[in-house]
Amino acid sequence: MSHPALTQLRALRYFDAIPALEPHLLDWLLLEDSMTKRFEQQGKRVSVTLIREAFVGQSEVEEASGLLPSESRYWLREILLCADGEPWLAGRTVVPESTLCGPEQVLQHLGKTPLGRYLFTSSTLTRDFIEIGRDATLWGRRSRLRLSGKPLLLTELFLPASPLY
């Protein structure tokens, strides 16, 4: 199963540098904290619609080439993050199999738990970068995060109902 928003997410084109945008947009796009928490601060009940969770080969995560270690298998999680049942964000997480050792194994078992609820409670979380992307009228971003120094790639597309717009 797939979702049209995930097709748009994969079509994001990234800026080489942070573009000159309205402060309101940058506030959302460069947020270092949990997007789940940010949505909850809007007074909304946040839920996850799980689209896909599975191990995949390198050919299904080409966007991670050069950003993550080259491995034969990656854990792929694709979701819609909803606020009061309305999709606000499409998310795609790519995790190298080598990252999934020790406590990070929990990344395979999040189910309908928002990724941010796990990541941002970890004292070992660091972020290497945030890149801003755009596809037609929609904004997105991607970040390489590390848990205990082990990388994962998180890509987010802000959907039209999102307060970013």
UniProtKB/Swiss-Prot annotation:
Residues binding substrate: 35, 77, 115, 156
GO BP terms, alphabetized: pyruvate biosynthetic process; ubiquinone biosynthetic process
EC number: 4.1.3.40
InterPro entries: Chorismate--pyruvate_lyase, Chorismate_lyase_/UTRA_dom_sf
Gene3D superfamilies in alphabetical order: Chorismate lyase-like
UniProt subcellular location: Cytoplasm
Any single Gene Ontology cellular-component annotation: cytosol
Pfam entry (one): Chor_lyase
A GO molecular-function annotation: chorismate lyase activity
Keywords recorded for this protein, A-Z: Cytoplasm, Lyase, Pyruvate, Ubiquinone biosynthesis
Main location: cytoplasm
Superkingdom, taxonomy of origin: Bacteria
Pathway: Cofactor biosynthesis; ubiquinone biosynthesis
Reaction catalysed by this enzyme: chorismate = 4-hydroxybenzoate + pyruvate
Family, similarity comment: Belongs to the UbiC family.
Assembly and interaction partners: Monomer.
Described function: Removes the pyruvyl group from chorismate, with concomitant aromatization of the ring, to provide 4-hydroxybenzoate (4HB) for the ubiquinone pathway.
Name of the protein described by the UniProt record: Chorismate pyruvate-lyase
Biological source species: Salmonella typhimurium (strain LT2 / SGSC1412 / ATCC 700720)
Gene name per UniProt: ubiC
